[in-house]
Swiss-Prot record:
Residues 465-523 are annotated as: Disordered. GO terms for molecular function: RNA binding. It is found in: Nucleus speckle. It comes from Gallus gallus (Chicken). Keywords: Coiled coil, Nucleus, Phosphoprotein, Repeat, RNA-binding. This is Paraspeckle component 1. Residues 471-487 have a biased composition (Polar residues). Disulfide bonds: none annotated. Belongs to the PSPC family. GO terms for cellular component: fibrillar center; nuclear speck; nucleus; paraspeckles.
Amino acid sequence: MAANRNLKQVRIENSSPAAPLGMVGGGGGLKGLRGLETENEAAAMALVPGKEGGDEEQEGGFTIDIKSFLKPGEKSYTQRCRLFVGNLPTDITEEDFKRLFERYGEPSEVFINRDRGFGFIRLESRTLAEIAKAELDGTILKSRPLRIRFATHGAALTVKNLSPVVSNELLEQAFSQFGPVERAVVVVDDRGRATGKGFVEFAAKPPARKALERCSDGAFLLTTTPRPVVVEPMEQFDDEDGLPEKLMQKTQQYHKEREQPPRFAQPGTFEFEYASRWKALDEMEKQQREQVDRNIREAKEKLEAEMEAARHEHQLMLMRQDLMRRQEELRRLEELRNQELQKRKQIQLRHEEEHRRREEEMLRQREQEELRRQQEGGFKPNFMDNREQEMRMGDMGPRGAINMGDAFSPAPAGNQGPPPMMGMNMNNRGTLPGPAMGPGPSMGPEGAANMGTPMMPDNGTVHNERFPQGGPSQMGSPLVSRTGSETPQPPMSGVGTVSGGPGGFGRGNPGGNFEGPNKRRRY
């Protein structure tokens, strides 16, 4: 039976006139089975279970699929499927109690208190529990009518101050952190608008107590708005069965109040006066409640406005803090960047200094190497230059640097030294052949001391304009011997070195720069 409990066969005895079937369509399932009016226990057992096979029974019955009694998303064996059975016989056994509900599916919880005559049983779905309650309530069992009600949900909580955007799913998800939730519902009005209230049903009492304590001590928020929910134990009301007449206790007060039937009080009577005072009291209560509700609503609106302003200010503060944090990060990054640039600059300066030092070292080494080379080969170039100078002075002809004599510069007398040439003392030329210049015989026409052959014979008819005509001739031929003492001539500067040439090897100026009162050129 446990393997095939989702498929039950209920056979209704056609011969029983007191067992009609009432089918109420609601939500796609069977709402209730009514019309079972039995007088004894045998009549209460008129509904017998059918066969447990998977095939439908065709003989005087119909098949009920228990799965069809579960609504979409409904959980099975919840607290809402729990029934309270009162006025039980004291000698009833657990097997008899189960057999009483076995036609409505496999129960999961069975509890019997024989001393007080009540018990609890939990069925698979709410619909099956409603069917069992409708069928078995008032049934006579061992001369006792059974009283069946839905058991009070001990793990249900009322949730208030809900936001309009909270749904059933969000409410269940929020309270699932405390324990398994069987059902969570947000209460709405007739137009489907949220009333700000709801309830949550847990599977057991410990999670419900935990949720109640946590929400009472702290502030439990369901949305972004800092609006905490208010959790309270759920008040249990029976708004289905109510209080039937058969359950009323027939006390003295009951009989006294039932003496007068329902009626309207007549104006001017005692009843009308006090009835009016009761109505005034109710009206005052209503007005005060409305005023309290209005004050609470205004306080809530004011609090919401302050909360919005404070949240805006809080967001601005967070943005400022974030901006300051980012500025601090940027400043730190800028400092790191500046430090890195400073390090790179220092490294670059060190590299440049090292490069400059290496260049200076290379230049100094090059200079030292050049100086060393000059010191090693310095004497040989000087010797060669002197040798070349001597060779040039010995090989030059009549128009050379030494044979510069002409009609205007005759050779000196035997006791007369050669004139200095641009500061060069001819007497100091130790390398020239022949005796030193001075008194004595003059050298030949090609000699170093002969200043060249005369360009004009000295016949005494041509005189130099630079000198007085009465003076002795100084332009004579070197071959003519001179007698007597003659006054030495002043040194001539007409013969000199070529500008830029080595000393002693220059050629005479063709134009001749003659010092004296007359500086015209002579040709």
